């Protein structure tokens, strides 16, 4: 069941990425970003990262809602462009979705397919029972793991947010 949930979430993630990268009206592009962010957090939650999924959901989607509100207010159109208005984008959207379904079906139905993932430090993310003092707090362990093993993730995320803000400021600045 968990495999099916992972495949469904991955398919929705790909569809939402195609949705906002096909550059429809900013209203629909922002909606695609919000859906992809929420589904990405669902994938993190599916693999057991409850604290990280919650933090990404709160920070990323909080920022995206602000950007979504600004782009909606600045680029309001009487007749917004949708995916159906451009036949090429719609056909590529359908073709990519069908390819994703075929690949997912092949991966599920093939008995000989073996996917090997090697996570060397995965045991460090597990919450252990210490015996006499009970369990460690999951939130504290999540923060410790984020800043010890995920230092590069924090740096890349911060840099991406700065670049995103600069791009939005440059686009909305005008002439």
From Swiss-Prot:
One of its GO terms (molecular function) is NADH dehydrogenase (ubiquinone) activity. Its EC number is 7.1.1.2. Keywords: Electron transport, Membrane, Mitochondrion, Mitochondrion inner membrane, NAD, Respiratory chain, Translocase, Transmembrane, Transmembrane helix, Transport. It is a multi-pass membrane protein. Pfam families: Oxidored_q3. The keyword Manganese does not apply. The keyword NAD applies. The chain crosses the membrane at residues 1-21, 25-45, 48-68, 88-108, 149-169. It comes from the Eukaryota. It is an enzyme of class 7 (translocase). GO terms for biological process: mitochondrial electron transport, NADH to ubiquinone; mitochondrial respiratory chain complex I assembly. It catalyses: a ubiquinone + NADH + 5 H(+)(in) = a ubiquinol + NAD(+) + 4 H(+)(out). It is found in: Mitochondrion inner membrane. GO terms for cellular component: mitochondrial inner membrane. Disulfide bonds: none annotated. Core subunit of the mitochondrial membrane respiratory chain NADH dehydrogenase (Complex I) which catalyzes electron transfer from NADH through the respiratory chain, using ubiquinone as an electron acceptor. Essential for the catalytic activity and assembly of complex I. Core subunit of respiratory chain NADH dehydrogenase (Complex I) which is composed of 45 different subunits. Belongs to the complex I subunit 6 family. This is NADH-ubiquinone oxidoreductase chain 6.
């Amino acid at each position: 069941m968990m495999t099916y949930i992972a495949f469904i979430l991955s398919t929705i993630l790909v569809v939402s990425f195609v949705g906002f990268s096909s550059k429809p009206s900013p209203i629909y592009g922002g909606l695609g970003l919000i859906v992809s962010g929420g589904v990405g957090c669902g994938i993190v939650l599916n693999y057991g990262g409850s604290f990280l999924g919650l933090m990404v959901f709160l920070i990323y989607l909080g920022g995206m809602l602000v950007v979504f509100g600004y782009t909606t207010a600045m680029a309001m159109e009487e007749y917004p462009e949708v995916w159906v208005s451009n036949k090429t984008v719609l056909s590529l959207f359908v073709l990519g979705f069908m390819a994703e379904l075929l690949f997912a079906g092949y991966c599920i139905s093939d008995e000989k397919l073996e996917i090997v993932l090697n996570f060397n430090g995965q045991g460090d993310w597990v919450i252990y029972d210490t015996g006499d003092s009970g369990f460690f707090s999951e939130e504290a362990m999540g923060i410790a793991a984020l800043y010890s093993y995920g230092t590069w993730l924090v740096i890349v995320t911060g840099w991406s947010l700065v670049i995103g803000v600069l791009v939005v400021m440059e686009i909305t600045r005008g002439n």
